[in-house]
């Protein structure tokens, strides 16, 4: 029993095992370097930020400029991250075949591409949205590359707690694109993404802890071990569930329906968090939590949009009226 547990802990896990699509889809070098798999969730939280505004839905041109500018900025951030970490990637077997370490792309071409994406992104957002959305997008790019990648990641096991601000900025971009200011709803979704990020990322870090250890990156599982990490994941998981329900009160309309539809998402998240806490050394449990956490955030943003549909608003109002009638009958 001890030996099997030891194998479970020490056997390296590839990202291909965690994200099955990586096995099936081999991206060209120029696309691989911009990390396209990360972009859809960033755009989803951007749309979630929009849905929290009174001005939802947005005109199609402004929506397209916001999402296009956000996608280009995320691509630039991914490319600059690859540039910064190419020496680390070269030292890890799992990442040594990436575009930059393997020599399939040159440093200069990646840098020029990142600058071009940044300039086009800024132009789209300034001309088609507003300066606040453009400034926040640039802030997100800089915070990911400079704050997280360059400063926090190699220095502290709490890197993702503070560095998670980069991934939490898209809701602010969405809110500002819709209304010209951020508003309470935008700040709520920003906070939700901030507390969701550690639980999401540490589940992945448990799977890849040997990789991080081999290059001296102080991720929480490599510094404190899986038991401490699982407890921390549990804390952030419960915080995520608590904060997610506050969306009922910040949605301009449809809050009750959103809260009801959110129940199965939160139940599943808590179930997976509890399973990992009970056995932090089970990599399948960490893998399951990581995968569900991605679907969870997509689901929250989907529910925010669904709750703002006219049919949902009518149904939400009927639910409220039914509850009032029911409570009146007992008074």
UniProtKB/Swiss-Prot annotation:
Classify the source by domain of life.
Bacteria
Top class in the EC scheme: transferase
A single GO cellular-component term from the record reads: plasma membrane
**Pfam families linked to this entry:** UbiA
Could you tell me which InterPro entries the record lists for this protein?
Protohaem_IX_farnesylTrfase, UbiA_prenyltransferase, UbiA_prenylTrfase_CS, UbiA_sf
Where does it mainly reside?
A: membrane
Keywords of the record: Cell inner membrane, Cell membrane, Heme biosynthesis, Membrane, Transferase, Transmembrane, Transmembrane helix
Q: Annotated pathway, please? A: Porphyrin-containing compound metabolism; heme O biosynthesis; heme O from protoheme: step 1/1
GO biological process entries: heme O biosynthetic process
Give any extra note attached to this record: Carbon 2 of the heme B porphyrin ring is defined according to the Fischer nomenclature.
Q: What is this protein called?
A: Protoheme IX farnesyltransferase
